[in-house]
Amino acid sequence: GHQQNPTTGYNIKGDPAGKIDLESLCKAMGIADVRVCDPYDLQKTEETVKAALSFSGPSVVISRRPCALLKYVKHQPAFSVDQTKCVGCKSCMRIGCPAISMKNGKAQVDETLCVGCGVCEQLCGVKAFVHH
């Protein structure tokens, strides 16, 4: 992440460049099962990966989402943790998000690092994560 790749239409310097259609490339290589998912949607991503794993031949899963670290990517509002709801189960820590840490046994969000992706909200069983 954090740099251009052949599917973005820009080179490593950020200048316009040829763009590769990754799905077409995979199909041209003989991959019959090519699936695309948004990695911010955990349920659909899990369903996509399970379907690909159950396919009888080679399968490709393309996770498509602009890198959150690129300057031109627009972010959603940051999340925060309702400390009265957080039970300290650490489910949110499974994603390794740099914005989430534990303090006094409960999750907290560094709003300067949060890109508002909502993955933490999807993982939290007690709905302690809230948008601003």
Regions found by a protein language model. Name each.
Residues 15-19, 30, 38, 54, ...:
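Active-site-proximal structural scaffolding
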Residues 87-108, 115, 119-132:
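Iron-sulfur cluster-binding cysteine motifs and their immediate structural context
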Residues 51-102:
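Glycine/aspartate-rich loop-and-adjacent alpha/beta segment that forms the canonical ThDP
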Residues 10-14, 77, 82-87, 111-115:
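Short, contiguous acidic/charged loop-to-helix segments that flank catalytic cores in large enzymes
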Residues 1-60, 73:
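Thiamine diphosphate
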Residues 17-21, 44, 78, 106, ...:
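Residue-level preference for nonpolar/small residues embedded in alpha-helices
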Residues 37-40, 63-66, 83-84, 111-112, ...:
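Fold-independent oxyanion-binding glycine-rich loops
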